[in-house]
Amino acid sequence: MPHSDELDAGNVLAVENLNIAFMQDQQKIAAVRNLSFSLQRGETLAIVGESGSGKSVTALALMRLLEQAGGLVQCDKMLLRRRSRDVIELSEQSAAQMRHVRGADMAMIFQEPMTSLNPVFTVGEQIAESIRLHQNASREEAMVEAKRMLDQVRIPEAQTILSRYPHQLSGGMRQRVMIAMALSCRPAVLIADEPTTALDVTIQAQILQLIKVLQKEMSMGVIFITHDMGVVAEIADRVLVMYQGEAVETGTVEQIFHAPQHPYTRALLAAVPQLGAMKGLDYPRRFPLISLEHPAKQAPPIEQKTVVDGEPVLRVRNLVTRFPLRSGLLNRVTREVHAVEKVSFDLWPGETLSLVGESGSGKSTTGRALLRLVESQGGEIIFNGQRIDTLSPGKLQALRRDIQFIFQDPYASLDPRQTIGDSIIEPLRVHGLLPGKEAVARVAWLLERVGLLPEHAWRYPHEFSGGQRQRICIARALALNPKVIIADEAVSALDVSIRGQIINLLLDLQRDFGIAYLFISHDMAVVERISHRVAVMYLGQIVEIGPRRAVFENPQHPYTRKLLAAVPVAEPSRQRPQRVLLSDDLPSNIHLRGEEVAAVSLQCVGPGHYVAQPQSEYAFMRR
């Protein structure tokens, strides 16, 4: 049945009265209620709202992926204009017909790339599969196009990456592979569910530009699901604000930012961390928690003077971590990824040291090496005066009670067969810290501290949104009262209101228990708020380290200045000028086996502030 007359000529998508529910304990739980919106050709519609507000399930309903998960979807109208200009009713399509629609006419970039990529196929095979299926290309043609797409999303050594598996890539790299896969068939509608959450600010700027370029070329409609209001200001034409499964406000990006009508929209905008808000301040400060009823009311910020003088709790010297790459008929190691090269730093009790840098710069590998989750080839790691890089596995388990890790991908770090209560209680049982009833009470307390309900303990990971899963991982890391927490992008998946609550919780625990944080992040506004000191990493080496105020207010290294310049501004009229060109090459940290890389020499430029001298300013700016 043709539907061309039902869809306005300029629209590529129209949704009327979308209702989504899930069955739980024989009860119907509404996730989305009476949602209606349209999308014009070449337009970007940003859907914003809290974690659990219904943003992602709306996208999954459009892709017809909810039926398999037991979702109940009802909709008066769900019309899509295909690339062929035919208009179809999505709810009327069979499973076989939808396979031809997904990827070709409507593509989706998922929030968690590790769980969206097939672990048993190489990156090249997965991108080429979509191209072969929808463009009738040969295997050779598809692989050539796959390499071109990896080049477009700024992945260095694209030819090498084609033959790698997802687990061999960083989180940001995996996200870029997902973006390349979604864009490879030039769909009529692109649904991007938090596509830049795992990306650093410079790559984020390039990906946003890439989506804009392809959108203009193909007159592609884009639905951009995000909690980053800076990204919304930069990319959106219209904004749809969701709260508890309903649309509470919609309008142009200028209307939403300059004249928000709904209290929740005003609260959402007021909670956005602004780069430069800590100017003139030496210590971390809590985020003001803004209520829905009183969006303009802010509690006075409290300075966090928590650093304990004396010996550092963690001392790292000349840490080296490399990964072998095999090639040739004999599958010999011919090259190595120099992930971490001679990295040194100290961490004091009660201090937050933030590691920042681009995806693939070695931030996460540094954190994993400290817990021996990856083996290092050189250097010393000393915790509480004891060298831990040479400990036996038995002694290492006891150490992990004092050093906990919050992983970047929450779904991959939670056991899908265990309830989240069992996942949180597991470390308490392993280390024999609390008896049964006390452990259960501890789980309930932890869930409440991270903004969840105690009864959530009986649910499974797939029943939560991405942001809620990240809060569960934070609760599990806090269960043992560790001395050091390594937080790898711990708040990147959270919306601004929950992010503020979690960071305030981390600061409170730091004040109460003297916990030291190694905070790995690409969100410069959050780093500015939470950090005592900041270390900037580039190609596996620290190129600038110092007090947070010195690094942010007086950045000395050109790469640090580049990172700060790339931060999106949550103001549509103050859009950042595009400084990073998609045609530029990213340097590679892959070298021949045995080849040594010159270690950077840090020079003191102020109290505790050390900077490497770049060989070429142009190499870091890449304008």
UniProtKB/Swiss-Prot annotation:
EC number, UniProt record: 7.4.2.10
InterPro entries: AAA+_ATPase (IPR003593), ABC_transp_ATP-bind (IPR050319), ABC_transporter-like_ATP-bd (IPR003439), ABC_transporter-like_CS (IPR017871), Oligopep_ABC_C (IPR013563), P-loop_NTPase (IPR027417)
Keyword entries, A-Z: ATP-binding, Cell inner membrane, Cell membrane, Hydrolase, Membrane, Nucleotide-binding, Repeat, Translocase, Transport
Keyword Nucleotide-binding: yes
Cross-referenced Pfam families: ABC_tran (PF00005), oligo_HPY (PF08352)
Cellular component, GO annotation: plasma membrane
Keyword Oxidoreductase tagged: no
Coiled-coil regions listed in the entry: none
Main location: membrane
Single biological process term from Gene Ontology: peptide transport
PROSITE patterns according to UniProt: ABC_TRANSPORTER_1, ABC_TRANSPORTER_2
Residues annotated as domain ABC transporter: 15-269, 314-564
Binding site for ATP: 49-56, 357-364
Localisation: Cell inner membrane
Quaternary structure and interacting proteins, as annotated: The complex is composed of two ATP-binding proteins (GsiA), two transmembrane proteins (GsiC and GsiD) and a solute-binding protein (GsiB).
Protein's name according to its UniProt entry: Glutathione import ATP-binding protein GsiA
Species, as recorded: Escherichia coli O157:H7
